[in-house]
Amino acid sequence: MTLPTSLCDLFAQAASRCPDNLAVDHTEGSLTYRQLDDVSNSLANMLMGLGVNQLSPVILLTSHGTFNIIATLAILKVGSCCVPIDRATWPQERINYVCQTVANSVILNTTSEPFMPSEGAGDVLNYTSMQSGPSFRPNPVFQAHKVAADDTAYIIFTSGSTGKPKGVLISHKSLCLYSTTSPINLDIGPGDRLLHILSVAFDACACMLFSALGNCGTIVPAQAEDVLLQAPSCTVLAATPAMLKNLPSPTTENSIFSNLSRVILGGETASPDLLGLWIDAGVQVLIAYGVTETTSMGSIYRVERDPRTDAINPYIIGGVLEQSPIWIVDSELRIIKNENSEGEIIVGGDGVAQGYYNDEQKTRSNFIHWNGSRIYRTGDFGCWVLDANGRRVIEFRGRKDRTVKNQGYLVNLDRDVEAALYRVGESFGLTSVRAVATGNGIVAVVTPSNVNTSALIEKAKDIMCSYCIPYRIGAVDDLPLSPNGKVQHNELAELIKIIDEGQHNQENKADSQLSEKIERGKFGDDRHLDTLLTVARDVLSLPGQSFRILQPHDSFFAVGGSSLLAFKLVSVLGQHGLNIPARELFKNQPFSDVAPLITSRAHSSTWRLTEHDDKTQQTLAELQNQACQMLGLVQNSFEIGPLTSLQLDLALPTLGDESRNINQVKIAYNAPHSGIMRRAWQGLWQSEPVFRTEVSLAVGCGALIVHNKPFRKYRVVSHSCRDKYEEAVKGINMGVGLGCTLDVLTYHKTSDGLPYLPVSSNHNSSSSETDELTVVLTIHHSLMDGESLKLLLDKVDRIALGFSQPLSGSSINANLALIKTQNSRDSEVRSFFSDYLRHLSPENIAPGQVSATENLEGSSSRETAFFETSVSSVEVSDFAKLNCSSAACIYYIAWAMAVAAFDNSPDVLIGAVVSNRPALQHHEHAIGAYMSTLPLVFNFRDDEETVVDRIQKTMEDLATVGEYAWARSDQCGIGRRMRTLLSMQFPLPNESSKPPALWTESAENSDFPLCLLVESSGDFRMLYDATQFNWEAAQRLGQHFKHALYSLHHETRVTDCMTVNRLQENLAKQSEIFRLKPSERIVKQVLEQVMGQFPSLIAVEDCLGGKLTYSELDKLTNVIAHHINSTVPNAEVIALYSDGTIQWILGLLGTVKAGCTYVNLDPRSSVSRRETICKQCGAEALLLPNASQASEAPLMDNLKVLAVDEMLSGNSKKHNGKQPDRASLDSSLVIVFTSGTTGNPKGILISNRSFLSMETSYGTTMFAAPGRRIAQFMSPVFDVCNMEIFSALLHGATLVLRDPSDPYANLHRVNTAAVTPSAMAVIDLDDFPNLQLIYACGEPVTKSLVKRYTKRALLYNAYGPAECSILTSIERLIPGDQVTVGRPLSTVRVYILDEDQHPMAPGDRGEVCVAGVQVLRDYINAPEQAARNILTDPWYPGERMYRSGDSGSIGRDGRLSLHGRIDRLVKLRGFRVELAGVEHAVVSGPTEEGVSQCAAIAVNGLLIVYVSFERSQQHDSLSNKERIAQLLSRLREQLLPSSVPQEIVHIDNFPRTINGKIDTRALETQYSSYKNTSIEKAVGDCPITRPKIEDKLAHEWRQVLQLIPETQLQESDDFFKLGGHSVSIMLLATRLTAAFGKKITVRELLPSPTFKDQINMVRALLEIETFHKEEPQMLPPLLTEELTSIEKQVWFQHQVATTVTAFNIIRVIQIEGAVEIDKLCQSLNNILSIDPIFRSNIVEGPKGPARILRNSAPTVQEVDEFDIERALHHRFNLAHDYLIQVYLARHGCKGDNNDHATLVILTSHVIADLGTLQNFLQLTSTAYSGSTLVPLDRPKHLDSKSWTRIPTFSERKFWSEYLKGLIRRLGLTHHQLALAVGALFLQWFSAEDDLVLGAPNSGRPTSQEQESLGQFLDRLPIRITPNDLGNDDTMTKLTEILNRVRHSSLKALSNAISFSNIIQDLGYPSGGLEHPLFECDCFYTVS
């Protein structure tokens, strides 16, 4: 932001920065900056109508107030200058003098008293009213006058030393300088409130006015009588010492200056005592020296005590300000540098005024030119001294006109009399001294009036020189002051005379009193309807936004009311003397029916503090005495009252745990707002009573003590290290006991590497801006509830915006009122709750047995779990309105349902946290704990109850119970025995707040066992006691709540909302009994234990009716294990032919019991693949289920083939004893082979330890237990198959095998299955009524599938790489919720890392990495893959971490979201596209789209998406084509154009891989074959008609834009919006020229970007039979030795360059796969010899540089390794070196064609560009494929017409006009140009000058150049004007700016000619290396 040079610009910048901040706060009207700007514009228009202009000063007759400020701005905006007159303090004589002096000027009167000007004065405009607010519309035609920096802004009339007013001319520049100079501008910022009391005609008043208005502060104008009223809210003050002396002391009790942090004093010298009083109170006091003639600028000094003597020197005025240089000179104006040498003070700089009004002679005498500077001679004397800290400063020695002769001696009244007499009189209580010389000698006046003046004179005789002692001293209470607040010395002598005559009467100062501002409305009592509608509208209105007018037929909740607002409505009606039970509002009656129920009540029934009865007064007195005696407090230094019952309940647990019942909120702010918010919070901390409130349990039965003065200090800690800052923010302790703390943490980035110096807490300077600020408020719950926090946060925001801080109500009075209500209505409330709870059994009241946890020893018992909602708060609110209820009601019902399912009980008691403030009339704004937890009873016994009925019943209960919101817990009949509560949280600041918060976070430590806190967004937190609820139970409760909340919105019956939750709870509790615990056992041991535990249960069942009990299974598998150990002794790995039969399962388990590792082979795979797997894993035997399958075995030596049926035949069964344990925890259980992304199988070892670790986690066992039936559904080679088998058999469940003829048949006979989403998409859950639990594995799950499957079943999303033992996370999927894979298992750690292995921030995407015990040790025979994927955990040394290759992010709730594979990044049309991201966008649409599955593929440069739709939705009215159109429309809105698919294809059944996943390669093949034909139609020789033009043009668009052939182009389609750019439009022009046989250039295409325009353009060209065409002239072709113009330019630059390596071009290519390296070398050598360009050298001859051709071409050089760094710094000798060098490094043995190699091409820009390299590689590919290429005789690029074509006249004319007006030297440095370019991208636009950037021009317009080798790359100037950048309109959209810049670049491109021609045509020297057009090239490089 540029520094403003006029006050109008200064204010405009502030109004733009902070439009909604309060600018002025006064009874005449409080205005924001936007409003102040508007109303001052309106007044400016009025002034312009009176003829006011730059040449006519305006006399402003004014006083402090809003109108004064509006008028000042209006005068300045019309270009006039302001002549302020203080009507409140100036005598009429002086007013008349100024009006006559500034004759014929308009007089603007803002005072209420009319003004009659004297003769000769101008017109009078009275301005005492204004328009503002939402209805105000400023005059749209007003435009502020363009004000120059040197224009006069003010004429300030001062009395001076002569008494005759003189007008000082002060410029805009001078006042801007003051307002922007620290610290004389008091460092005012947003949130600061300036107590504006200086006279409005005082120069310093104008300075401070714009110091505030120019820096977004708030001005609080105040006359003397208003100071005490306005001061408490202000943070800064400008005053004279005399004014300050008359203000109350800042150290008194309840000081009105508790918020004041900075004071600036000037005008006269203050006494040391006065200064000490303020700085000792912690206020920063600045002494400013300056006179009106220097715009109050000169020097400034911060008052400090001498650290040795504790004294204050009041005469020090500071050192030299850079903006206002100051000197001390002798009488000859020679500079005095010596210390203690007195001289005159002179001041220079831009603060020096312009002179005196109409007094040129005086101007010349006082404003002189001296040593090259214009300075002002002040007439003041001073000298250089050293202050207490050794700094060189000026000590003020008085004015030269204050030096008088007394008794023949020169005496300085300031120094010799006043200062000396003050020192003498300190012991007499003297506070100030003023002296004046009279004809009889020196007289003095001292204060106060009780000073013994006679004794003072006598003592002075002992110390002072006799000629310095006044002959007469008078004592008064107040000194006479001028209107500017200075002491009037010329009245002192008269004052002495009056004292002597005894006629002096001191003026009495009456205290101002506040007038009554709130007037009660008078309402008729005819049914009270009008009152009810008016009050309800006010209650429903938002701040600054009125609610619509309510009608009698409206009902409260239907129009948006809530339960909290209902109680507020009752409270407000009570203030009007009206009473209505809240339950009547909850009945959803129209207002017309509610009004008759309102009754009147006497106002006297309201209990107030002033009505204390005797008993209360006695109680308070006793508490006061006890506090003094027991706590040592001083009487009258505090207020005290009793604690409420709730406060006592909250306080008692904290005695044992200082962090119990503590609330903490953290709010972070970024740099623009950090300073404001820091000051706002610190001001609130000092002034808010709650922060000086103490809870004492030692006094009475517990007391609340409110101290009069703050006794707690906030903490400020600064950090320059980001990590330490974040660590400190996280580590703020919550153990504050019964008190509170405020921590202010700041983060400062330091660019110099030096540490940031922390600022102490009492330092108030804001000169250093903070990069980030975090405020942490930690407070005990007894001091503050949620609504109190909201009140505090609102106050902080108001303070930050400049508004005054509203006073909080008395918490002691509120407590007394609450206790009185509770006591007076005790019997009533007890009777009510006794009846309400009568049907509830005791076990539902007291906490029963809840899920116990094994709490870790020493860990906190309080835990917090965060959940994202399934239904947004907006949806809940809308649903509540639809049902005429409150949002809280919906949440209460959902929570009750969740608890009912968890407890398996139909009766539930929920604690509802409600505010009891509505019962505390006149105490609604008290800060404290004013809420109650009331019991809500829910009964879910009626299976037919509807959701609507339940909502109505709950609303009635809320209304009835809410009547007793004031009740104590014991009065509710259950005390604090409720174990669960729900609390609606108030919103915290966010990015939309004013000022905005960067982030917020809250934490609580409740004493309740289970608390649900619903945030304003709908997300919720669960606080639970870990000794009663474990983590898994808390997660289930949260999931129950989410499901119930969603179901309430979509189900009809209540029981249907609870079915799935009850199922989940039953499964969880049943499976918990049989869940494995961590142990040192192996799988064999666990398996044998289960077989012995459940011998008669069915273990395995097949499709043919075959069944085996666990006992039978045990024996048969023992036989197989025995056979394996005897047949293949010491075998390690056994392969299994996995045909899905019982024999296969027997073989698998037998292998495990034999202590071997098994590997499943897929019968569907080829024999060769099975052989490959057996070889890789080293299998020693193959186990066939049946001997008849022998032909399926690979023919391998040393592979023993065994058959299970043969093992179990005959006498073998007698060997059924238990086998010894051969395996260990670390030995492998199974080897899983996956194809991966390469197609080659990779072997993954899963050990016993890692597998059993996975099985011990919650949910990984598929909730298996005896009686559960689990399907074996997955492919045997899929890792999840192992989870199916062992989840069943390790937990006593039944494993149901597949039917080979019907893969879905076994799902009819199971209740649990693991299924891929692909399979889920094609089956109907209704066909499988027994299926209760589904695990989705292997693929992403769509929201549509979630919605369909979760209506009656549990759906879990399972994720885990096989490398991490199958599962690493699982998540119950709930409709409406985000689809994630949940939180990591307890046995793994999941990190999200970037490419450099650094952690990503929450929410950011990165690679999913998994660490922990489940990570594999190694791959089988894949060391490179292992080295790449299996790393050491950086944070846990010695443990492994696996890089999954999956893209993911972790949300705020800790759940992992997947975004596809990282390796699915493709490049289409030059843009990077994440296929996984496209798929995610497709499936994350609304469920109504019905997308069940999708796959994105890239084929031939096109982005294609395949989708399938839900079967149930295919019969809707929309066809698949219409669904695809809707989907495509949404994707165009949501995705970048490059990521929008060119085509979406519907498919019923996706092709599958062997593991059941979608086969994308098969889709690519399918699409290629489907789209293999072209739709291009032949065009005959017949006349071209419009349809054929359209067809041809459409075909060319599709080719250039790479659109699919079927794309139907619309007439409105825009070439650029479909992906076109500058290069593609050139290509289109070339293709259209060939297609239509007419020359079509970019110049014709640019004005016609739409399809319709181009049709018309082509048609018009074709219809013209003859037309004049300007053909360019041609030069003779270039000779072989001649250089092109570009080659010459590059050669010249190469000769003079300091870094010639900058001209190097290097390309490194990694070659992998089946490439014949020798053949590749031969092809490269062929191409190097074809075009002589590669044999070129450039030599300097007599005619300049020329080309010579070498005899031989360069060849490929084979090297062992290549040093890239060295190549980059290779210095080509253009005359002797080959200018292209090709290197090849093999990475295997020569002749090994399957290995990989590195190809490096190094060349010089003199002969090549990027196009050359691309063509070189393309030619190499052609030669490699076997094609023969013919060698050329001369370089092909020399034949291009580009070198011989002379630009046409129109082309030359274009460039002359395009660059017209551009100065030859821009006057910008490289750095400034870089800033300008950066400004373009950062939207910080500059209108200072034109920008011309150099852009690359490929120089290859035709196919001849496009296919040539050689250097064509040229430069093209792109002019970007201020208009392009939007400087003419600050609201210009970014897209419009980009379009303008693009248009300019395309214009240049369409007229491109040789850059050398452009330079020549502009008249610059030919061949100049440093052309003046631009010094910055802008490139876009695609890597």
UniProtKB/Swiss-Prot annotation:
It is an enzyme of class 6 (ligase). The modification O-(pantetheine 4'-phosphoryl)serine is found at S563, S1622. Disruption phenotype: Completely abolishes the 11'-deoxyverticillin A production and conidiation. GO terms for molecular function: ligase activity; phosphopantetheine binding. Residues 11-405 are annotated as: Adenylation 1. The keyword Ligase applies. Residues 769-1047 are annotated as: Condensation 1. Gene3D superfamilies: 3.30.300.30, ACP-like, Chloramphenicol acetyltransferase-like domain, N-terminal domain of ligase-like, Nonribosomal peptide synthetase, condensation domain. Residues 1652-1976 are annotated as: Condensation 2. Residues 526-602, 1584-1662 form the Carrier domain. Residues 1089-1469 are annotated as: Adenylation 2. GO terms for biological process: amino acid activation for nonribosomal peptide biosynthetic process; secondary metabolite biosynthetic process. Nonribosomal peptide synthetase; part of the gene cluster that mediates the biosynthesis of 11'-deoxyverticillin A, one of the dimeric epipolythiodioxopiperazines (ETPs) from the verticillin family that act as mycotoxins. 11'-deoxyverticillin A is required for normal conidiation. The nonribosomal peptide synthetase verP is speculated to be responsible for condensation of amino acids to form the carbon skeleton of verticillin, whereas the cluster-specific tailoring enzymes are involved in further modifications leading to the production of 11'-deoxyverticillin A. NRP synthetases are composed of discrete domains (adenylation (A), thiolation (T) or peptidyl carrier protein (PCP) and condensation (C) domains) which when grouped together are referred to as a single module. Each module is responsible for the recognition (via the A domain) and incorporation of a single amino acid into the growing peptide product. Thus, an NRP synthetase is generally composed of one or more modules and can terminate in a thioesterase domain (TE) that releases the newly synthesized peptide from the enzyme. This is Nonribosomal peptide synthetase verP. It comes from Clonostachys rogersoniana. The gene is verP.
